[in-house]
Regions:
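Non-globular, low-confidence helical/coil segments that flank catalytic cores
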Residues: 2, 178-180, 184-187, 191, ...
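Membrane-interface helix/helix-cap signal primarily in integral membrane proteins
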Residues: 2-28, 95-295, 589-593, 602, ...
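Transmembrane helix-bundle segments that form internal channels/tunnels in multi-pass membrane proteins
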Residues: 2-119, 128, 230, 314-320, ...
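Hydrophobic alpha-helical transmembrane segments in multi-pass membrane proteins
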Residues: 36, 44, 78, 86, ...
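Proline-centered turn/helix-capping motifs that create local helix->coil transitions or kinks
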Residues: 144, 259-264, 344, 367, ...
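Short glycine-rich loop/turn motifs
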Residues: 152, 267-269, 375, 564-567, ...
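A generic structural motif
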Residues: 156-162, 462, 571, 698
Length: 819
């Protein structure tokens, strides 16, 4: 046995040696010990998070036979990668770093006071508590500009009275405040509804609970009336977050000079300079995401390099040299990073710059990979949760990818114009040398663009669920334009201190405002051109392709949990249909992300049941994000202003809305059959809910009946005229605004094997609905309320139809003959 282990260890060591040689040969850099330690620490944090996220995982860890192979291979891969990058690293050192990162993450995250407090709260209903604490950071105002809609801030809790396990203290809490925003450092006491931060209820929905959990926030408090809160003490007038926010606001206002009437241009410029994301950018953000240029919104090392280069040039003109120049430039860059919020990319650039600077002062040039590893290791020690944040992963992954792929790609591109290697260099012609000199910067730029695209490809696939080939070309244009934007922006900001003297009416300063105006105006012109390039590139066919999540099967039907509204996605393997799209909020946060996650970029038809804003409010947003071949709506008159506006838009586009009535068949074939059962042509009804489309989707595995918010009027007509067409396996129903729905005769005619009550927020508290659900459950029917199970997915299996609730519930409906 010992001989076999020694032989296996020898083989593994040989493989690792050959892997080291391969990495060094293709990338041109030697293995770096600090990068290896950073990767080993990363593995330790991942292991701690996985083991203690669920108690069942601890049992798997103790009982190795039940240990999941996938997680074991994942941790082992990180361990071997760390050892691969470190030449001559003792196994004991790697083990110490692994164990240290493991224990550090357990102490800071898994066993934190905030985690313990959140676990003491009930999972369903909030708890009314009396909270005392200090406001941390600057409160974030909510709502549209100029309209007071409360704020959101983080509170360092000093006491919580009324929680199930007694008073709690010493953790952060997210507070939703309704009223005038408090100041940073204010000590407050208020009564609020305290609960765990809600997680997603639909596939691919943003996981707010996980996001705030990585920030050390596990619970939230809803303050309905801020007037009843008590301010125990006011914060100091000098607070670091407040000063940073004020400085950032002053500098952003300085960039507004000359751009007062161009709000979107100024917002984009402020975002590129300081990472300030205004409301006006939401309209154009999708263009940048679809072209792979969303990095322009983040403050990165490019900003700091540009600022440092400009400041160094100015100081050299003033006669500064040596370490004094380097120190001044570094301090100014650090202050700029602090003013921008010190994001992950800014922190990485500062740490790497500090290591490079110290290396120069002690005559020990720093290696790129080693410096990157040191920066990652320091970031992990400072906050172990940093490794789970997208900003950290993208920042370090991009630099690592450029270091790994940049030189090989540049060599391949440069070889396109390089003469044959067999020809001696003295024999090269002058025109060949000129071509090489001209082509070299082009090759470097193309290598940077292609290397960046390759580096972020895993995040594009697994996070954004899309591939953007157009990004390799667009970045060749927009990055130089952004470079000019930053240069003009920093030139304008360098004039800010002198421009302040204008208020004192000093001679020779007044013309400076004209210079700043021209700089900002020129910058705004370039920003507009950049926006035009990005918008045009987003419309290039196949420049952006939705591919869906690689390891997740697309459901055959999906009932979204969209609050008061409704939305159902149908898929027969060849084409997809969408029944309603929810409100504008849910369309943006639920429907579009899910369709992108499943790779559904085109739908055969969008069928709108009625004019309720909760069912069709997001139609404009959906139309801009997804290709819709046809839109279908009831032939009855609809008074919804949102619908009328969209109907006119379709007419202008040359693809008008198709009216449908009872008896129309929208999809027919061997795979699926989609039929309209209600309303009949000429029906007169006052309420929109009485004119809802009722549709039945039938396939080889079963059928789905969608009645939206139909009431007694629709059910009576269907029983009289279309009773034989009602029988379905799954019934997706809402709740009528004021009328009775779900009568016994109607349920018996459908003979459903599963009922999904899609309405869960506004009207579900009605005693009649509660009693209806309880009565049919007692009768033996499966009735799922989306308040309890969230979204519902249906998958065709060999033995029948598998219905899965996103939060809970799971059942298999055996196949039965269809009529």
């Amino acid at each position: 046995m010992k001989a076999k282990l020694n032989r296996a260890f020898t083989v593994l060591t040989g493989w690792m040696g050959r892997a080291r040689e391969f990495v060094s040969r293709i990338s041109g850099w030697e293995p770096a010990p600090l990068m290896g330690l950073a990767v080993v620490a990363y593995a330790g944090v991942l292991a701690a998070d996985w083991c203690f996220h669920d108690a069942a995982n601890v049992a798997r860890l103790i009982c190795f036979s039940a240990f999941q192979v996938r997680e074991f291979v994942w941790f082992l891969s990180f361990w071997l990668l760390g050892v691969l990058l470190v030449r001559g690293l003792p196994w004991s050192m790697g083990g110490a770093v692994f164990v240290g990162a493991f224990l550090m993450h357990c102490e800071r995250h898994c066993f934190s006071k905030g985690h313990e407090f959140a676990r003491s709260l009930p999972t369903e209903e909030p708890v009314v508590c009396r909270v005392t604490g200090e406001v941390r950071g600057v409160p974030q105002l909510l709502g549209e500009r100029g309209k007071a809609a409360g704020c959101r801030f983080r509170l360092w809790v000093s006491c919580v009275e009324g929680c199930p396990k007694g008073a709690a203290t010493g953790f952060q809490m997210l507070v939703h405040w309704n009223g005038a925003a408090p100041g940073c450092g204010d000590v407050l006491r208020f009564r609020a509804q305290v609960r765990r931060i809600a997680g997603p209820r639909n596939p691919f929905q943003f996981d707010a609970a996980s996001f705030y959990m990585r920030e050390g926030v596990w619970a939230e408090a809803l303050v309905l009336n801020g007037l009843n809160a008590e301010v125990l003490s006011l914060g100091d007038w000098i607070r670091f977050p407040v000063l940073v926010e004020r400085v950032r606001s002053v500098l952003c206002e300085h960039l507004r000079i000359g751009l007062e009437d161009r709000v979107q241009t100024h917002s984009l410029l402020s975002s590129m300079m300081f990472g300030v994301h205004g409301d006006s950018l939401m309209e154009v953000r999708e263009y940048f995401r679809d072209t792979g240029t969303l990095h322009l919104f983040a403050v990165s090392g490019l900003n700091m390099t540009m600022l440092g280069a400009m400041l160094a040039a100015a100081l050299r003109l003033a006669g500064a040299r040596g370490r004094f120049l380097e120190l001044v430039v570094f301090l100014v860059v650090v202050l700029y990073a602090i003013a921008t919020g010190m994001g992950a990319s800014s922190l990485r650039a500062i740490l790497m710059g500090c290591l490079v600077l110290v290396g120069r002062w002690i005559s020990r040039p720093a290696l790129l990979i080693n410096s990157l590893g040191a920066a990652a290791l320091i970031s992990i020690v400072e906050d172990t949760n940093a490794v789970f944040r997208i900003g950290f992963q993208l920042s370090f992954g991009l630099v690592l990818g450029l270091a790994l792929f940049g030189r090989p790609v540049a060599s391949v591109i440069a070889s396109l114009v390089t003469p044959d290697e067999l020809v001696p260099r003295p024999l090269w012609k002058d025109w060949q040398w000129r071509r090489i000199r001209v082509w070299k910067p082009v090759a470097v730029a193309m290598a940077a663009s292609i290397g960046s695209w390759i580096s972020v490809l895993p995040w594009s696939v697994f996070l954004m669920h899309q591939i953007t080939p157009i990004a390799m070309l667009v970045n060749l244009v927009v990055v130089p334009m952004a470079f000019v934007n930053l240069a003009l922006g920093f030139a304008s900001l360098l004039c800010a201190p002198f421009l302040a003297l204008e208020h004192h009416a000093l001679s020779g300063v007044a013309p400076l405002r004209g210079i700043v105006t021209r700089l900002n105006a020129g910058n705004g012109w370039i920003v507009d051109r950049l926006m035009s390039v990005v918008k045009g590139a987003s419309e290039v066919p196949y420049g952006n392709v939705w591919i869906g999540y690689p390891f997740r099967k697309r459901p055959d039907f999906l009932v979204f949990d969209v609050g008061d509204g409704g939305a159902v996605l149908l898929n027969d393997g060849r084409e997809s249909w969408l029944l309603d799209c929810g409100s504008v909020v849910f369309a943006n946060s639920v429907v579009v992300p899910a369709m992108q996650g499943y790779g559904v970029g085109t739908i055969a038809g969008l069928i709108l049941s009625h004019g309720d804003s909760a069912h069709l409010g997001g139609i404009d947003l959906l139309h801009n994000r997804i290709r819709i071949r046809s839109v279908l709506h009831s032939a009855l008159k609809d008074r919804s202003p949102v619908w009328r506006k969209f109907e006119q838009r379709r007419v202008i586009d040359g693809n008008p809305v198709m009216p449908v009535v009872a008896g129309d068949v929208l999809a027919t074939g061997e795979v699926s059959h989609l039929e309209v059962l209600y309303p009949p042509d000429g029906l007169r009804a006052a309420l929109a809910d009485d004119k809802c489309l009722v549709l039945r989707w039938r396939t080889k595995f079963g059928s789905v009946l969608y009645t939206a918010d139909s009431g007694f009027t629709a059910e009576r007509w269907l029983l009289e005229h279309r009773r034989s067409s009602l029988k379905s396996d799954v019934w997706v129903r809402g709740v009528h605004e004021s009328d009775l729905s779900g009568t016994d005769d109607f349920v018996n005619a459908i003979e459903p094997r599963l009922i999904v009550v899609s309405d869960t927020r506004r009207r579900f508290s009605s005693p009649g609905i509660d009693e209806w659900v309880r009565r049919w459950r007692d009768a033996g029917l499966r009735v799922w309320t989306q308040r309890e199970c969230g979204a519902v997915e249906g998958f065709v299996e060999k033995d029948g139809l598998r219905c899965v609730g996103f939060l809970r519930e799971n059942c298999l409906l055996p196949l039965r003959p269809l009529k």
